[in-house]
């Protein structure tokens, strides 16, 4: 009966996520909100509710090599997607190849997978997600872009110091590192502070989904849809193969495996379209690819969550 309740909870929460996404889209279509409002929500999520959700999941950790596995997989998953993007566009010009590297890579863990997992699984599970997203964030914030820039233009345009500055200007990444340090040192944040941060942390799933609904765009032609579907298929088939290796062969505990698998099926990072523009792309493909990946991911995450609690 307990499993049935959990499965029903997963289904209702997934439906709730879709409804909140639709609510954001509906409000935008009725001109009650705008694209700019979505950007405001994105700022709130990245700088307030997501860091608070991370702090609220703080638990003591004993260092072991297995702790590095989710972190390494967060980096490796990105590099694998970079390679797939490069190989599937090897006959395109350099700029298109560079854009293909960056606009289908990265995992939207902080504003999608983590809120989903936060709503469905126990808080103690979230730390594996944080470990994965620490590695993922390093690649999403700058790593993938530098690889794409190398492909498109043959050289990096940024110094090492500017890369480090960019990485540490990310509040979620700094919060991840702070939480990991505290957990490994077995330090705890006073409960009075956690009582305050949990207010914002608990709001993270709702605000993140409302933000996504406000930012998504469904205006895609039939030909564009099939092109995008093909590219997403490459992404999710590759991640499916990696997820199978993680689940059946990687020597770590079951909870860590399950959380990493869920992260591997997260949507494309929201930085994908931003980096495509920075490379010089004028195509809306990166934004459309990002939108479709959200709906594919919520379906896959729901199915996987049901399997994990069955």
Enumerate the predicted regions with their spans:
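Alpha-helical transmembrane segments of multi-pass small-molecule/ion transporters
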Residues: 1-310
